[in-house]
Each structure stands twice: as structure tokens, then as C-alpha cells.
Regions:
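N-terminal nucleotide-binding beta1-loop-alpha1 segment
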Residues: 1-25
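Acidic donor-binding segment of Leloir-type glycosyltransferases
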Residues: 53-77
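The conserved acidic donor/metal-binding loop of glycosyltransferases
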Residues: 109-113
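Conserved alpha/beta core of the MobA/IspD/sugar-nucleotide pyrophosphorylase nucleotidyltransferase superfamily
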Residues: 2, 161-219
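Short phosphate-binding loop-to-helix
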Residues: 69-104, 162
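Short, glycine-/small-residue-rich phosphate/pyrophosphate-handling segment
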Residues: 144-171
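A short, N-terminal amphipathic alpha-helix
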Residues: 37-54
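Conserved donor-nucleotide/metal-binding helix-loop-beta segment in metal-dependent transferases, i.e.
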Residues: 115-141
């Protein structure tokens, strides 16, 4: 670890096939589940691209319904080999290193509809102090971000209780104040309510306002 150094980042964002996305929100979103998932991913990607610490965003997906709108926002799209989440992330990371070997590489979950560029910049600045680091989710069970400095092996351990696995793998847990939007992933209706309280990005806010007019969502 070299104190005080910072890097620009290549961020890899995995977007699963949308017919399988957000199953725990299926009852709430009904036939609009795909549209909702695209909106959430769009807000995540847009916020990441607006972060000054981010040089590029690489979306890994096999679904054209996600690839087309996310590429239109400015993301680079890499085809998901469909061998699991961590394989998808490693595929995106390999692409990042091939095009920008001097950049740090991070994995960011796609379901952060309240993500704020300034809060992401704070998290990335903290991560740059360590060879590998991660941000736990709001429940302190999963992980929303994992990143490594340039030249450090990229070994993501996402899925389920990934916080414990990232700790066991030697990654530094980033207990940084003021990054609530980086930690607030959305898998359930309760998660969505918490994200609404933080303030949704414009894509998700538009869908939520249409589906639930009294939600108080605003972009």
C-alpha cells in the first residue's frame, strides 16, 4: 500500500439477463420488471460515468435489452460468457487491463439506483490506498464494490454473504462515512424504499413515479 496515491478507475458493472433480474421485486414491478431493471442499471452506469475518478465503465451482459441503452450512455459493452457473476467480472476486468493497464480496476454492482458520483469518488479514493478493498452493502452482508490497484490480481468473491469472503481473501473493508448511496443496492421492496429516501436517479425515478405515483420518488 502506498499512502496518498490515487488512480483513475475502470469499473466493471455486470448486468444479468433481464428476464432473470430482480426476481425478489417481481410482485412489485409485475410486467415492468425488465424496464425497472434497465432503469436501475442506467442510473448506476450514468452515475459512475459522471464520477471524476472513473476513466471508463465496462458493462458485462449477454442481453441486448441492457447492452443497447447502457452503451448509449457511454459504457463499453463486453459479452457475458454466462459462467457466473465472478467469471463475468473477471472477463470485464481482463478487457479493462487490455485497454488501460495503468488504471485501477473495480467491480460495481448494477443495482445502485441512488448512486451519487461524489460518494462513489469518496469510496474510490479510499480504495486507492489499498491493494484490494471493498464496500459492504447496507446490510453488512454482501458487497457493492470491490477494487484493486493497478497490477494487483483481481479476485472478486461476489454472491450471497460476500462481505465475509472478501474479508477472508485479504481485501480491506472500507468503513467510510458519507457513502450511503454506494452501499444501497436494491433487491427487495424495502431496499427500494430506502433508495427512494436517498433520492433515485432520473431513470429509476421516472419508472417508480409511473408505477407508484405516491412513492415520493424524484430524480
Amino acid at each position: 500500500m502506498l499512502k496518498g496515491m490515487s488512480f483513475r478507475w475502470s469499473l466493471v458493472i455486470p448486468v444479468k439477463t433481464l428476464v432473470a433480474a430482480k426476481t425478489r421485486l417481481a410482485d412489485a414491478t409485475g410486467p415492468h420488471r425488465t424496464r425497472f431493471a434497465v432503469a436501475v442499471a442506467s442510473d448506476t452506469v450514468a452515475a459512475a460515468l459522471s464520477c471524476p475518478a472513473v476513466a471508463r465503465v465496462i458493462v458485462v451482459t449477454a442481453d441486448p435489452a441492457a447492452a443497447v441503452p447502457l452503451a448509449a450512455l457511454g459504457a463499453e459493452v463486453v459479452t457475458d460468457p454466462d459462467r457466473g457473476l465472478n467469471t463475468a467480472l473477471r472477463t470485464g476486468a481482463a478487457h479493462a487491463v487490455s485497454v488501460a493497464p495503468g488504471e485501477a480496476v473495480g467491480a460495481l454492482q448494477a443495482d445502485l439506483p441512488a448512486l451519487r458520483p461524489a460518494e462513489l469518488a469518496t469510496a474510490l479514493g479510499a480504495a486507492a490506498e489499498f491493494d484490494q478493498a471493498f464496500v459492504p452493502d447496507a446490510l453488512d452482508v454482501g458487497t457493492t464494490f470491490y477494487g484493486v490497484r493497478p497490477g494487483v490480481p483481481f479476485t472478486p468473491r461476489f454472491g450471497g454473504e460476500s462481505r465475509a469472503r472478501h474479508l477472508a481473501g485479504g481485501a480491506k473493508e472500507l468503513c467510510v462515512p458519507g457513502i450511503d448511496s454506494v452501499r444501497r443496492d436494491v433487491d427487495t421492496p424495502a431496499d427500494l424504499e430506502a433508495a427512494i429516501a436517498l433520492g433515485l436517479g432520473r431513470h429509476t425515478a421516472a419508472v417508480v413515479a409511473e408505477l407508484w405515483p405516491r412513492s415520493g420518488a424524484s430524480g
